[in-house]
């Protein structure tokens, strides 16, 4: 039986695979696939953005090799960055309660 961490890893892989490949390459997210992922899986984040260009800038910043798409490692950089931001927010909220 997989551990909670192993299930989380499996889930990240499954989500990446769910969105990648619709434009032909199952090892990468195209810009269209990235936008679909963001608007579906991170809809609250996307809807709260006042700047319409934020997703384009995120894609460019995450695309470390400038090939116009995100591989799994580049995708994980997004997930890691969001996890760090959530963790920092949690810590700030916890410290305010003390």
Curated annotation (Swiss-Prot):
* GO MF entries: calcium ion binding; calcium-dependent protein binding; protein homodimerization activity; S100 protein binding
Name a single GO biological process: regulation of cell population proliferation
The record's CDD domains line, in alphabetical order, gives: S-100A11 (cd05023)
Q: Where is the EF-hand domain?
A: 12-47, 50-85
- List-wise, which residues carry Phosphothreonine? 5
| Quaternary assembly | Homodimer; disulfide-linked.
Q: What name goes with this protein?
A: Protein S100-A11
Question: Which organism does this sequence originate in?
Answer: Rattus norvegicus (Rat)
């Amino acid at each position: 039986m997989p551990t909670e961490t192993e299930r989380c890893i499996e889930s990240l892989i499954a989500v990446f695979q769910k969105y990648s490949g619709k434009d032909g390459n199952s090892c990468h997210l195209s810009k269209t696939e990235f936008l679909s992922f963001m608007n579906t899986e991170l809809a609250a984040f996307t809807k709260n953005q006042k700047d319409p260009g934020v997703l384009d800038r995120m894609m460019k910043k995450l695309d470390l090799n400038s090939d116009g798409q995100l591989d799994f490692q580049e995708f994980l950089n997004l997930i890691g960055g969001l996890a760090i931001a959530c963790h920092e927010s949690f810590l700030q909220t916890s410290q305010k309660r003390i």
